[in-house]
């Protein structure tokens, strides 16, 4: 008997894309799956569309809730899942018909399978290859370095890894990456890669990750604070230090757009722990130095002083 796989699908006002998403699940050649659809208070026809699929196929289950955000929707989906494995899918994305079949043929005794994926924009489609990993620490390291994407949607994960681990429901994005950090710092997982792409990640101009307003950066900072706590144990200090350096360079957005006041930017910098750069690869630090020089050249005088202080933190001694 084949193992059951659970799809978790949060939906909010997705009537323009949900048909394509649900049809791609329906076309899976691997038939032993269930779909937990959490309609997060949609005010368009998304909920009705999802209901129509549940009437057609009893593997589709729809739960309608008041709007509480994507993290709450994912958490509810996980709590209702009964499959041995779990994979997430977003309502504006879609998957190839052989995805589950190939993944289930490969996963064997592994805990997490990471596949490649397609990055789709209005300009075309790009194949994105993920770096090989075999352990929790390797996967965590590669995600923070940007060599593996941190989302859950191209990762098949054993459901028991979700036990006693919850999404941070006050996050509006990066909730899946933070959840993955928690799994990888809690369990010693066997990880394998499947170098085929099945998931089509649709990047559109209206997505929350394309925003640059204060709400976006506030959420990003909140995520960073949570992530630093997850990475605080001594055994993950090296990875945490890389995360700190990467976060420092990400402050270019609020600096250039003047979303935060000078005092707020200074507070952002000061709240980060000082990384031990002697443990970090010279190449990684050098890239961050170059990015800071660019920021310093463009920034106002007051911000220059703050950035120079930051640069001294990451300077190779």
List each model region and its residues.
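Conserved nucleotide-sugar donor-binding catalytic segment
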Residues: 139-214
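Short, acidic, metal-binding catalytic loop of nucleotide-sugar glycosyltransferases
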Residues: 23-32
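A conserved acidic beta->alpha catalytic loop
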Residues: 24, 39-49, 90
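Conserved donor NDP-sugar-binding/catalytic core segment of glycosyltransferases
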Residues: 98-127
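Membrane-interface aromatic/basic loop that binds lipid-linked glycans or pyrophosphate carriers
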Residues: 255-317
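Glycine-rich, basic loop-to-helix element that forms the pyrophosphate-binding segment
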Residues: 65-81
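Short aromatic/hydrophobic "clamp" motif used to bind/position activated sugar donors
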Residues: 86
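N-proximal low-complexity "stem/linker" segments adjacent to membrane-targeting elements
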Residues: 1-24
């Amino acid at each position: 008997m084949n193992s059951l796989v659970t799809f978790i699908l949060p939906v909010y006002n997705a009537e323009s894309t949900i048909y394509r998403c649900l049809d791609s699940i329906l076309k899976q050649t691997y038939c032993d799956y269930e779909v937990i659809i959490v309609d997060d208070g949609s005010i368009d026809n998304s909920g009705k569309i999802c209901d129509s699929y549940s009437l057609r196929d009893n593997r589709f289950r729809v739960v309608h809730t008041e709007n509480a955000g994507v993290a709450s929707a994912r958490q509810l989906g996980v709590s209702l899942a009964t499959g041995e494995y779990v994979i997430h899918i977003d309502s504006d994305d879609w998957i190839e018909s052989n995805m589950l079949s190939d993944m289930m043929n490969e996963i064997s005794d592994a805990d997490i399978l990471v596949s490649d994926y397609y990055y789709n924009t209005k300009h075309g489609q790009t194949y994105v290859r993920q770096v090989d990993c075999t352990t929790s620490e390797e996967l965590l390291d590669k995600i923070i370095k940007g060599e593996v994407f941190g989302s859950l949607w191209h990762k098949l994960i054993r459901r028991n890894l979700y036990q006693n681990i919850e999404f941070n429901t006050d996050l509006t994005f990066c909730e899946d990456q933070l959840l993955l950090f928690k799994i990888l710092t809690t369990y010693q997982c066997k990880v394998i890669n499947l170098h085929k792409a099945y998931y089509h990640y649709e990047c559109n101009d209206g997505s929350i990750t394309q925003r640059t307003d204060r709400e976006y950066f506030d959420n990003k900072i909140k995520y960073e604070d949570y992530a630093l706590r997850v990475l605080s144990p001594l055994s993950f200090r090296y990875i945490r230090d890389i995360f700190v350096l990467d976060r420092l360079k990400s402050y270019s957005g609020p600096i250039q757009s003047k979303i935060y006041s000078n005092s707020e930017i200074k507070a952002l910098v000061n709240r980060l722990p000082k990384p031990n750069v002697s443990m970090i690869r010279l190449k990684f630090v050098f890239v961050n130095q170059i990015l800071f020089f660019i920021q310093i050249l463009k920034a106002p005088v007051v911000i220059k002083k703050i950035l120079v202080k930051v640069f001294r933190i990451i300077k190779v001694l």
